[in-house]
Each structure stands twice: as structure tokens, then as C-alpha cells.
Amino acid sequence: MSSNNQSSSVAQAATSARTVSAGSAEATDANSTASNNNNNSSSTAAAGNNSDNSSPTTGTGTGASTGKLHGGHTAVNTKERVVDSVPFPPSHKLTLAEVFDQRTGKPNHELLKQHFILEGRIEEAPALKIIQDGAALLRQEKTMIDIEAPVTVCGDIHGQFYDLMKLFEVGGSPASTKYLFLGDYVDRGYFSIECVLYLWSLKITYPQTLFLLRGNHECRHLTEYFTFKQECKIKYSERVYDACMDAFDCLPLAALMNQQFLCVHGGLSPEIHELEDIRRLDRFKEPPAFGPMCDLLWSDPLEDFGNEKNSDFYTHNSVRGCSYFYSYAACCDFLQNNNLLSIIRAHEAQDAGYRMYRKSQTTGFPSLITIFSAPNYLDVYNNKAAVLKYENNVMNIRQFNCSPHPYWLPNFMDVFTWSLPFVGEKVTEMLVNVLNICSDDELMTEESEEPLSDDEAALRKEVIRNKIRAIGKMARVFSVLREESESVLQLKGLTPTGALPLGALSGGKQSLKNAMQGFSPNHKITSFAEAKGLDAVNERMPPRRDQPPTPSEDPNQHSQQGGKNGAGHG
């Protein structure tokens, strides 16, 4: 498109583009933004444990059911499930022949959907084929893809598979709706591999109408640090994880929607002046800790975006520990230089599921829009999720709430590992009690006819006492392990991420107690702001070997000051 045509398109969109509240019969102009406060009823997800021991899910394990006998005694039935009203997950793993249609060679995504909802799994072969076939399609796409409206834009998913199912209910069937996902499909939630397999199967089935961008979590560094690698190894294998990493390297970094909107996971970079700079990037690699590729995935708008105290275009992102904060001035400068209407991004949880930032003075349209599609993020944020539907120059924000999902113990811990310290403590207590049934006088008594000498009797008594002391020490060790295990589980339950604060575990029992100070077991996180504050440490880039110098130490640091000609790009 020529520059004149782009200007005409932007001008036309600026006057006609509107934001409409879903379900509302009345549209508003670009100066007003609304949303659908739609509290759709949640579909009930099947809860239960998996067929192996590595997936302990609340209320579904085999256990002892009871019944009353005469005299008030209780009969225990160890062959029946305690909660038999919840369907047991399918033990059968779908095969390659079952997953893929022999005629079309494409996966049966509807079968996968129903199987995953029941917590079923598939064999490694079809899992690898889905990931690799999807990667082959992604590899053919440009680094910045072009998408025409109508399109539904979705933000972070973060392994919340059951909420992803709700998203498609709200947004429309992928068979008839064009979708653009802005990244962060994995980590934090406990159903990340299901999200990847299902989205990749949709990509294979609808390659021209379903588009996937890369988020900052689609990399080896973060998936090793958070939960995705562990999830793949528990549910499938490390080969599946490695295939996912290779596929993530193929994901495009940005999309140009309708020649009007730049869609990206994070935001702008001081090294990206124009759209062509994005097209020239080499994306087929692990994202670096600094540079334009890192910025597209990691950067954020300033918290006081639109009300900045200074004229800096970019400042160091102290919240993420990498990349930059970009200002309203930097955003407007980029939009004007590239004939764009707005930037649509994800990357940050929003209480309402979305946020419209200050409008551009030249177009009257929000210069920046954040969309977030993981409701009740981490099960504690209490936020709504949203998708953005853009059609006929009308922007429609649709919100939705979270759906029920099966429960996993923190870090995919199985029930036997979780209960072992408690069981060990009780077993050693019983053993100590058994050995303590005889008194000191009884220890001196010998049942044999030949009496022992004083030295032999004293030695035997000391041997038995040493055994009792050793078992007592073992009991105390198990007691400490049990207490620490309970503290760890309790502390994980009190933090939004299910992860321990840094250094809490290495310091032992006292560190755990200190970390729990300020946390009340009866306290429940009730506000979005509280959850976001507690979770801030987990939004930073984890330490890595190629960490760049801080802005003050970097001799090649880009100029952060905006100028008359947009010189803030450095």
C-alpha cells in the first residue's frame, strides 16, 4: 500500500472506527470505549486425577468408602472411589490413527478438545506430529504477518485450557472466525501442553484464518524456570518439550492488522523505527536478553502512560529487569511515522481484561490497547478476560469470566510425594512406641538360664537404648520434613504463582517461617491489585548468562530523549 493510501486508510478509520460494548445496540465514536460486562455462565470442566500417580486431582482418587454397621461401627470399602460423581479421566491415550484423519492428514481437533477436557492424553507420536506439522506452517510465515479484518484478537492464555475453551465460546468457532493470538500460551497454568496441542491442531486445520504470535514465555529460558518443561516431562516426555521449543522459534513476532494496527506481544523498541525493521529481524532463535527482538516480547508502556513527567521516549524497565518502558510520546511518534492507527498488545494482566490508553491527538483513537485473555489469572487475580473483535471499522470488546478446572498440587507434585513425610513420621512414631514397651528393669532381665555378666548386661542395654535413640532421631527428622512440607505447601498456596519466594527453601525451616510472616493461613487474596503486587517478582526475566549491562553501564545505550524528529529511537 502506498503512503497516500495508508494515510487515507488511517484517516477513514479514525473517523469511522468505533468501540462498541458487546451486547449493546448503541455504538459510540472513537472518543468513547466500552466493554461487555458479560458474566457468561461457566461450563463445568471435568475434574479428576489422571490414570497414573503423577496427577493428583481433588476428589477423584480411589479410596475408602464407608457404611454403617450394627453397633455404630463403620465398614470401610477400599474398592470404591470416595467421590464417584466425578468422571474418571480416560486411561486410553489417543493413537496416531485416531488423532489424524487418514484422508486429509489433519488432526481431529474436536476429538482432541473433548479428550483434553476430560484430562485425557495422547501418545507421543501424534503429539510430536501435531507440533512439528504446526511448526512447518509457522516457519513459512513472515516475521510480521499481514491480516485483514474481520479478526478476533486474543491475549495471554498461560496454560488455562478450560478458559481457552470459554474463549472460543465467546469469540466464535475457529471454523468461521479469524483469530490472532498474541502469545504466552504456556507457563503458570497447569494445562499448557493441552493449549499448545489444541492451538497447533487448529493452526494445521485453519492455516489461513488462525494466526499465532510469539510471547516472551515461548522460549527455553522461561519454560525451564517456570512450569512448562516440568509439565511436558510429567505428561509426555522431554522430546515433546524439545519439539515445542523448536516450534516456538518459528512463531512470527508481529502482525499488521488491516494496515492500521500493529499487533505484538510486548510493545515498541528504541531500535525499531519502522515496520520494515521488524520484517528484517531473524526470529528463528531463542530470544536474546536485549535488543529489538527482546523488546517486542518484553517491553511495557509506562505506568503513567499519557501523563509522563518528562519527555523521555524510553526508560529502563525495572519491573521486568530487561527491555524498556515506552512513553505516550514514543507511541504516537511511531504511529505517525508508520501511518498506523494504534498498537494492540498483551503481556500485562488487566483487571477488566483490557485497557484502552490515551488517545492519539491526530486520530482521536486510543494510541495503545492491552488485551489479556486469562481470567482469574493464577486462580487468585480475580480479573476478567477479554477478546477484541474488529470488523467493519468497529471494535468490540467481549469480556468473560473463568471456568472450573481440575486441581493440581503445586509443581505437579503427586500425592505420594506430598504425603511421604507425614507417613514416615507416623511409622517411626509407631516403631519408637513398640521399642519403648519395656522398662529399664525389663531390659536387665535375661530369659536365658545363663545369667549375663554386669558388663554384658550393660552393653546389651546400651545397644537397645542406642537403637531407640536412632529411631527417635529418625522420627524427629520425619517430623521436620513433614512440617517443612506443610509449610512449603501452605506458602505456595498463599502466593499467587504457587511458587516459593526467592531463597525461602534454601534457608530451611526458619526461612520458611520468616517467609510466612505477614501471610495468614485464613487470608484470601481478594483484589487484583494485591495479587499483582505479590506476583511482581515473577514478572521479571529470570537471571541468565547473557544478561545485558544496566542502562547506566552500557556504553552503547540508546539515546532515551525524544526530539523534534523522533530522535528517541537512538
Curated annotation (Swiss-Prot):
Which parts of the sequence are annotated with region: Disordered?
1-88, 530-570
Annotated Polar residues bias? 553-562
- Which PANTHER family does the record associate with it? SERINE/THREONINE-PROTEIN PHOSPHATASE 2B CATALYTIC SUBUNIT 1-RELATED
Q: What is this protein called?
A: Serine/threonine-protein phosphatase 2B catalytic subunit 2
Which Pfam families does the UniProt entry name for this protein?
A: Metallophos (PF00149)
Cofactor comment in the record? Binds 1 Fe(3+) ion per subunit. Binds 1 zinc ion per subunit.
**A single GO BP:** calcineurin-mediated signaling
Task: Spell out the family assignment given in the record's similarity comment.
Answer: Belongs to the PPP phosphatase family. PP-2B subfamily.
Q: Which UniProt keywords apply?
A: Calcium, Calmodulin-binding, Hydrolase, Iron, Metal-binding, Protein phosphatase, Zinc
Residues reported in the UniProt entry to bind Fe cation: D156, H158, D184
Q: Which cofactor does it need?
A: Fe(3+); Zn(2+)
Report the function annotation for this chain: Calcium-dependent, calmodulin-stimulated protein phosphatase. This subunit may have a role in the calmodulin activation of calcineurin.
InterPro entries recorded: Calcineurin-like_PHP_ApaH (IPR004843), Metallo-depent_PP-like (IPR029052), MPP_PP2B (IPR041751), PP2B (IPR043360), Ser/Thr-sp_prot-phosphatase (IPR006186)
Which branch of life, at top level? Answer: Eukaryota
- Give any Gene Ontology cellular component: cytoplasm
Record text on subunit structure and interactions: Interacts with sra in a complex that contains CanA-14F.
Provide the binding site for Zn(2+).
Answer: D184, N216, H265, H347
